[in-house]
């Protein structure tokens, strides 16, 4: 009972995930093939890698909508640096540093200006996206082809397996463990929750707000860089638009996973399960031949239904009290 009270929403998401797979399996038996389930994650798991630190950002009361552009910038930067003759062993760490720098720029602007993070990261979304397009144009890379010619060892990396699991899925699982420990088992994680619940109280309590926010946005930038590296390896080319479609699925996963968009509460495990739930929903709809437009609409409907259901669950005692009062009035009348 205590386990359900503590992880009730996560268990609900896990049950929905199993139900979803079984329902799609009735329409297409391939959905029940364990190899299909494992290897199809490579198509969407990079969204999860970015959604994990984004969960911590949202729990802190902030938001970062620039990560899609950061992915594109890091991807094209990796291609240009490699094109310039820099070894991949050097180009990859440099790309991660660029991602961290993008995150620190976001944090610095938010802390210095005091402007809402949504406005700041909307600006950097265009800044990083424009920079990616500029670099792409200077390198002569076309929109759909991008920069190719990477070593086989690099392009094979994202398509290899470890213990029978695709490498991107293994990296995602490691990220889930890392961010779960950071958020739920460290002082920094407690600071994140406290800042999200009340930044004013956190400031009066002398919590390291600036340092914590810098860490969160930098981690989101690093995760974006890692996602960019995996995507370049998976597709075999570096393009400025690689992260263009990541924004809504990632935020959907965070909210669906149980994070309060206003801050103060959230779950890394919930986000991880929501990533799989949304990802397999898209995969299953494609397998049964559903058009992309309908697929997107159904994803939005799922989010609304689940969020409404969660809201009812959280406030069920208030609903029960209201029903009791209404019955009392009818009885007295």
Curated annotation (Swiss-Prot):
UniProt GO molecular function: transmembrane transporter activity
Subcellular location: Cell inner membrane
Membrane topology: Multi-pass membrane protein
Broad class of where this protein is predominantly found: membrane
UniProt cross-references to Pfam families, sorted A to Z: BPD_transp_2
Stretches that traverse the bilayer: 7-27, 45-65, 67-87, 90-110, 118-138, 162-182, 212-232, 240-260, 261-281, 288-308
Cellular component annotations (GO), alphabetically ordered: plasma membrane
Keywords noted in UniProt: Cell inner membrane, Cell membrane, Membrane, Transmembrane, Transmembrane helix, Transport
Family recorded in the similarity comment: Belongs to the binding-protein-dependent transport system permease family. AraH/RbsC subfamily.
Function text: Part of the ABC transporter complex LsrABCD involved in autoinducer 2 (AI-2) import. Probably responsible for the translocation of the substrate across the membrane.
Complex formation: The complex is composed of two ATP-binding proteins (LsrA), two transmembrane proteins (LsrC and LsrD) and a solute-binding protein (LsrB).
Name of the protein in its database record: Autoinducer 2 import system permease protein LsrD
Originating species: Yersinia pseudotuberculosis serotype O:1b (strain IP 31758)
Lineage of producing organism: Bacteria, Pseudomonadati, Pseudomonadota, Gammaproteobacteria, Enterobacterales
Gene of this entry: lsrD
